[in-house]
Amino acid sequence: MAELEFEKPVVELRNKIRELKDYTKNSQMDFSEEIRILEEKLENLEEDIYGNLKVWDRVQIARHAERPTTLDYIEHLFTDFFECHGDRLFGDDAAIVGGIAKYKGMPVTVIGHQRGKDTKENIRRNFGMPHPEGYRKALRLMKQAEKFNRPIICFIDTKGAYPGKAAEERGQSEAIARNLFEMAGLTVPVICIVIGEGGSGGALGLGVGDYIHMLENSTYSVITPEGAAAILWKDAGKAKEAAEAMKITAADLKELGVIDEIIPEARGGAHRNILKQSENIDLMIQKTFQQLNGISKDELIEKRYEKYMKIGQVSFSNASIWIK
């Protein structure tokens, strides 16, 4: 498993413990006490490092090559998943996957950004950066879900919508804007979960819902830290400083009222234990459905409207104002 820069002390100590255990197997000497001391030291070191992650550390975890994707969570959380393809206008976009599934026996529609696991798959899925047809496919599935009264669950994980010439010619901005407009008025429950990177309008195209949750080490922002640094300081190398200033972590966004709940991650990140991570997401989905249970369609839309009208409201000297 690929290790991140800030994890090196942990990796080195793990390797030392492993080497000592291997040596003990082929030796008459007893190193059990030394191993116990090192394992205790490792526990404390992991607690210190993973319990005090910096913003840039979380950015790296969110981008980890082995971080679970939408399809990974679909496999662990849902049954009878049937993937649907195409937007019925241009083509199919592999950067967004979606279809019909069952969640604990209840029919649902599941949609999400999809990155690749290796170079070949990343090229096929355009590194998780959707074209307009991806967003139109997602909207087609959402309207289908509304027609058949199925709740919608969206998994968000993209650096952003694809900014290429062909995507712009096919109406990238219109496709995203249309999704924002239509999702705001859907008469079925919509749960959105940021599982990795939530980048710019590319994330928002699947991000209008009744509840917005984020995994503990995911990020959600209007632009990547590198992009912000390049604009502000003409130096993408200052991405760490930009990340600190942008308020892109789950904790920051929970405090600002942009998201509703933070879903805990396995120590070291979701990629360390996908079964445990899936359980954590499962618990949050169950809790959210309980909160949405019994709400009428009119009330659902009204509460969704109120939710988004509150975002951006701040207070100075006890006087509320709107940021415009």
Curated annotation (Swiss-Prot):
Reaction(s) catalysed (UniProt annotation): N(6)-carboxybiotinyl-L-lysyl-[protein] + acetyl-CoA = N(6)-biotinyl-L-lysyl-[protein] + malonyl-CoA
Pfam families according to UniProt: ACCA
Metabolic or biological pathway: Lipid metabolism; malonyl-CoA biosynthesis; malonyl-CoA from acetyl-CoA: step 1/1
Keywords noted in UniProt: ATP-binding, Cytoplasm, Fatty acid biosynthesis, Fatty acid metabolism, Lipid biosynthesis, Lipid metabolism, Nucleotide-binding, Transferase
Enzyme class: transferase
GO biological process: fatty acid biosynthetic process; malonyl-CoA biosynthetic process
EC number: 2.1.3.15
Cellular compartments per GO CC: acetyl-CoA carboxylase complex
Gene Ontology MF, one: carboxyl- or carbamoyltransferase activity
InterPro entries linked: Acetyl_CoA_COase_a_su, ClpP/crotonase-like_dom_sf, COA_CT_C
Cellular localization per UniProt: Cytoplasm
Entries under Gene3D superfamilies matching the protein: 2-enoyl-CoA Hydratase, Chain A, domain 1
Domain CoA carboxyltransferase C-terminal, residue spans: 37-291
Protein family membership: Belongs to the AccA family.
HAMAP family: AcetylCoA_CT_alpha
Subunit structure: Acetyl-CoA carboxylase is a heterohexamer composed of biotin carboxyl carrier protein (AccB), biotin carboxylase (AccC) and two subunits each of ACCase subunit alpha (AccA) and ACCase subunit beta (AccD).
Protein purpose: Component of the acetyl coenzyme A carboxylase (ACC) complex. First, biotin carboxylase catalyzes the carboxylation of biotin on its carrier protein (BCCP) and then the CO(2) group is transferred by the carboxyltransferase to acetyl-CoA to form malonyl-CoA.
Official protein name in the record: Acetyl-coenzyme A carboxylase carboxyl transferase subunit alpha
